[in-house]
Amino acid sequence: MEYKKIIAQNKKALFNYFIEERLEAGIVLKGSEVQSLRQGKASIEESHAADTGNEVFLYNCHIAEYEKANRFNHSTRRPRKLLLHKKEINKIIGRTKIKGYTLVALSMYFNKKNKIKIELGIAKGKKLHDKRESIKEKDWKRDQSRLIRQK
């Protein structure tokens, strides 16, 4: 089992999308952003990634300002470049060109070498009836575990 110290998770992504494939990417950050992430002050709830030319950027990821960085602080929602291999970038570009597919941030974490990584998912949006179905499944599993505990 590999070591992951999770900084932020996007739990809504699993509810709103069918995750078809997962990728790990590095992320280009400034010093004040790294310090803020070490304190756990990040949110990737509404973040997504998109390609611009031959690069992939993470948009709408909120990393809070670091209090001690004063005038050298960063912008909280700036686009951040993701570090991927050329083959992975080409795969992402090909899959996101298909209608209905998007690239969603699933989690942000420190790996065992203490580098900040982001887990991306190539995802297809769920329809309303799919969301209702997943709610029913979750409720049924919860009820099953309650019944087992009572016996």
UniProtKB/Swiss-Prot annotation:
PROSITE patterns: SSRP. One of its GO terms (biological process) is trans-translation. HAMAP family: SmpB. It comes from the Bacteria. It comes from Rickettsia bellii (strain OSU 85-389). This is SsrA-binding protein. Residues 131-151 are annotated as: Disordered. GO terms for cellular component: cytosol. GO terms for molecular function: RNA binding. Belongs to the SmpB family. Transmembrane segments: none annotated. SUPFAM superfamilies: Small protein B (SmpB). Its main location: cytoplasm. Gene3D superfamilies: 2.40.280.10. Required for rescue of stalled ribosomes mediated by trans-translation. Binds to transfer-messenger RNA (tmRNA), required for stable association of tmRNA with ribosomes. tmRNA and SmpB together mimic tRNA shape, replacing the anticodon stem-loop with SmpB. tmRNA is encoded by the ssrA gene; the 2 termini fold to resemble tRNA(Ala) and it encodes a 'tag peptide', a short internal open reading frame. During trans-translation Ala-aminoacylated tmRNA acts like a tRNA, entering the A-site of stalled ribosomes, displacing the stalled mRNA. Keywords: Cytoplasm, RNA-binding. It is found in: Cytoplasm.
